[in-house]
A protein has these predicted regions:
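Soluble extramembrane domains flanking the early transmembrane region of eukaryotic membrane proteins
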Residues: 1-145
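Cytosolic-side membrane-insertion boundary helix
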Residues: 121-165, 231-238
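Membrane-lumen (extracellular) interface motif
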Residues: 138-139, 149-174, 248-270
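Hydrophobic alpha-helical membrane-embedded segments
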Residues: 158-197, 276-280
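Cytosolic/matrix-facing juxtamembrane and C-terminal tails of multi-pass cellular membrane proteins
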Residues: 192-237, 277-344
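Transmembrane helical hairpin unit
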Residues: 228-288
Length: 344
């Protein structure tokens, strides 16, 4: 039998249920997105061989990790053989190793060539040099990259228009932190020791992990530029302090963003998410590595081999010497051979 006592308690039950429903989601913590540990900025730093001043307007999650770009190779320094001289050594540039890892394919020999950046070509006009060097990474990648600072400027204009000064302050701190990191990267990436200047062309075979093989060709000096020496030097004490200060600024600005309006928080969140999407697409569409005044690009199609020995024998025939292959452990030395690889 129905008890009217329960019917009288129905409004109280509904009110309790209404209180149990969570309140509408707020966007006060949108600035915390900037603290996500993403690697779009570090990869971009490696692909262009440093930083550009326009990077200060590229605000993406993980921007406080830019100084970790020298770890982009995941600790790999692959064995390399110079097929023209017989020397065996390692590629010491983490950015170059990262690029070679990205173009390498298991069981395939990928050929890449090092050439001078179009900005160094004095045979063409200054205007053509500027345009070619600007779009050396490819037109789609360049357009996607420029959309990042355009997005930042657009969001700042809107925040100023609606009078959300907390949001403007948060973005201003993001930009200030980026300025510090960009300046430090530019200081660390200045070209240093690359060995003695030599003439002639070089031909390198690089053995990467997971049975990925890359053949890198170009002039000897250009090959040294992208493989030898130190890319990012260690942080000095003032630089270390500056980077720490910039990192704390990013954390502080994420907290400061809590005071932004709902619209401002939404704009900041959309800016960070859209920018990291654009930069990730830009990185994936970038078809070359820029290192100092050189550009590394793939050449032709990858060649598939059933055995690594088959690949080694073919290259030995082309180079007309096997000391580099012996030094890399690709082939056994011939009986009675007096030629020995040179390890450097």
């Amino acid at each position: 039998m129905f008890d009217f006592h329960h019917f009288r308690e129905l409004p109280l039950m509904l009110n309790t249920f209404r209180l149990a429903i969570p309140s509408p989601i707020t966007l006060e913590a949108a600035g915390l997105i900037a603290l996500a540990d993403l690697h779009a900025v570090t990869l971009r730093t490696a692909l262009v061989g440093g930083a550009r001043f326009l990077d200060v307007l590229v605000l993406v999650p993980g921007m406080h990790k830019q100084q970790c770009a020298d770890e982009i190779n995941r600790g790999e320094f692959p064995t390399t053989g110079a097929m023209t001289s017989g020397c065996v050594f390692r590629v010491e540039n983490p950015a170059t190793v990262s690029y070679l890892q990205s173009i390498g394919q298991t069981g395939h020999l990928v050929t890449a060539r090092v050439s001078q950046n179009p900005s160094q070509n004095t045979d063409i006009s200054l205007q053509n040099r500027t345009l070619q060097s600007l779009f050396v990474a490819g037109i789609p990648a360049t357009i996607l990259y420029f959309l990042c600072p355009i997005s930042t400027i657009s969001v700042v204009v809107v925040l100023c228009a609606i009078g959300d000064w907390w949001g403007v302050g948060a973005l201003g701190m993001f930009v200030s932190a980026r300025v510090i990191n960009v300046v430090v990267i530019k200081r660390r990436s200045q070209q240093g020791w690359k060995g003695a200047i030599e003439t002639g062309d070089g031909d390198l075979l690089i053995l990467l992990s997971q049975d990925r093989w890359v053949r890198l060709q170009g002039t000897i000096n250009d090959l040294k530029t992208v493989t030898a020496g130190q890319w990012l030097r260690d942080l000095s004490a003032p630089e270390n302090f500056s980077v720490t200060f910039a990192t704390m600024m990013i954390y502080s600005s994420a907290i400061l963003a809590f005071n932004a309006s709902t619209v401002g928080s939404l704009l900041i969140a959309c800016l960070l998410l859209c920018s990291v999407t654009l930069l990730t697409l830009c990185n994936s569409l970038t078809r070359c590595l820029q290192m100092y005044d050189c550009v590394v690009q793939t050449k032709g199609e990858p060649e598939k081999y059933n055995r690594r020995l088959d690949m080694a024998k073919k290259l030995v025939l082309e180079s007309k010497r096997d000391d580099w292959a012996v030094g890399m452990g690709l082939v056994h030395p011939k009986v009675g051979s007096t030629r020995r690889p040179v390890a450097v």
